[in-house]
Amino acid sequence: MDWSNQYTEFGKLGWTSFQIGASVGGTFQLGKIPVQYAVSVVNGNGKNQINDNDNGKQYSTRLVVGLAPEYNVNLGLNGGLGKVFSQKVYAVGVDITGAVKIDSHWNMDMQIEAKQGTNHILYNSLTSTIRTTDPNDYLIRGIYFLPSLRYEINHHHLNALEFSCRYEYLDSNFRLNSNPRQTLTPMLGFEFLKNYGARFQLGMQMDYYKKQIENTNQYNNNLFIFQIQSRF
């Protein structure tokens, strides 16, 4: 499972995933610290849309600061403002990534990311008689942590083994009607050929809600995963 629940939800809100727009970026040095930057403007509709459903635009920026290049430790800072159906929306986020080479066979990667923003999709799905007047009363907040351990085998066609276990916490309306979803996704991967030429993974996605709600998708469940990837 490549995408986190958080990434998927913020993609629906127009901040991540596939968006139509323009972006410029570059790099500079802050003393001895390398910094990458990017500034973007998108229509926030996502991909495969026939036309833009409103005149609003979403503006965002991202900074990536190289804290410890020897361990590939980077700090990412994200922020965005925009308008959706003439209502102001926002999103902010922070992430840390790192990679440590333990020895000639073992490597460890780690990612942690937290985001918060306006859940304007939820706001616009409610009638004016039951919602508040401010879209920013409807806020989504999430965090995930993903450690990954890799063992290089290089034995015949089997190149490496990977084990990861992602923990996620996501609450799509934490201010007014909190019902956080916690997800645990352990995965075991087998890589064949070089550079992920072929790989298959086995794992489980386990979802837990604070409150289970009948006749909705907000209920505890387990999903077995078998995934095959190949590059040509």
What does each model-identified segment do?
Residues 29-35, 68-75, 101-108, 152-161, ...:
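Short loop/turn motifs that connect adjacent beta-strands in outer-membrane beta-barrel proteins
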Residues 41-45, 79-83, 100, 114-120, ...:
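Transmembrane beta-strands of outer-membrane beta-barrel pores
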Residues 36, 43-137:
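Surface-exposed beta-loop-beta
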Residues 35-39, 73-77, 108-112, 145, ...:
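Transmembrane beta-strands of outer-membrane beta-barrel proteins
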Residues 219-232:
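Outer-membrane beta-barrel "beta-signal"
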Residues 23-25, 62-64, 95-97, 111-113, ...:
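Outer-membrane beta-barrel architecture
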Residues 1-64, 229:
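Surface-exposed coil loops of outer-membrane beta-barrel proteins
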